[in-house]
Swiss-Prot record:
Keywords: Amino-acid biosynthesis, Cytoplasm, Isomerase, Methionine biosynthesis, Nucleus. The lineage of its organism: Eukaryota, Viridiplantae, Streptophyta, Embryophyta, Tracheophyta. This is Methylthioribose-1-phosphate isomerase. The keyword Amino-acid biosynthesis applies. GO terms for biological process: L-methionine salvage from methylthioadenosine. It is an enzyme of class 5 (isomerase). Belongs to the eIF-2B alpha/beta/delta subunits family. MtnA subfamily. Its main location: cytoplasm.
Amino acid sequence: MANGNEGDKTLLSICYNRGSLQLLDQRKLPLETIYLDIQDTKDGWDAIKEMVVRGAPAIAIAAALSLAVEVSNLSSFDGTSDDASDFLSNKLDYLVSSRPTAVNLSDAAVKLKEVIKKAATTAKDANSVFQAYIEAAEVMLEDDVTSNKAIGSYGASFLKEHLTDSQKITILTHCNTGSLATAGYGTALGVIRALYTDGVLERAFCTETRPFNQGSRLTAFELVHENIPATLIADSAAAALMNAGRVKAVIVGADRVAANGDTANKIGTYNLAVSAMHHGIPFYVAAPLTSIDLSLSSGQEIVIEERSPKELLHTRGGLGEQVAASGISVWNPAFDVTPANLISGIITEKGVITKKGAETFDIAEFVRKTSGNL
């Protein structure tokens, strides 16, 4: 099975056929397009940890498929169906340890473990358990593209309905939430794509997204590739842009959303939400339901990953020359948490979650009401 993303291969972060997986090395973009072969879970873990692949949905799928490739190419396995189940479960636990903040990865692992456990109870041999796992991982790949397109559709319709003061809409976004962060199409950038397709997008503004520059390197690359009218700004210019009246709405993605709507996303998201609130601009999160963690009551429980000081001390997110003084201490959280009271709505593949006058969201109720369609 091949991934079903439409368009040019340059915008495929994940290239998969059964037994074969290549990941686009996003550290090299936009200057080089290089795909790395992923042969097993060790390769998958390294690719996720070292930011070859990033974006919560893409991380989950890349991890799942790295294990699918490993078991597809096993020359032999000396064990029972229960042994195969244990083997797969341990590999999934290992993959989850690569990046702790994005809930999609742990959510995918939980769902895949359920598939494995069920298969082990009915399978006659280990190979049948492996086959069940491979098929489940491939379904996740297909489902991600489908859910992203639904997010784009719901988001575009909602914005057109609520932003009625102008015929054209200008959107500010942060980090990268497009085809490069998912299996295809994107979440927040998917909404921008849908608005552009509908003919109502005036312009998209994207932040550079320091220190790893996902905005300048990746989002700008996607927008230019698709001829979407876009402007790159410095992270520190966002408030001035809002004050100038050039932003109608802010849309970002999410790595983990708590039950009350508190949202962990790329560092700098909180800044944008505060500025948007001050300027009376609606601030939306676009994310699949797999990014929602109902086990967490609020964002205070979200574990925030801290990354290498080198990403701040050197250019290109740590890959280039040193620009800061040796000996300076560094604080480099990869994410921050935006409180729910700053968020206007959460756009999902099942519709837009709103607060209905409250300070926080009742996401559990939304999930319950839409569970029949999941």
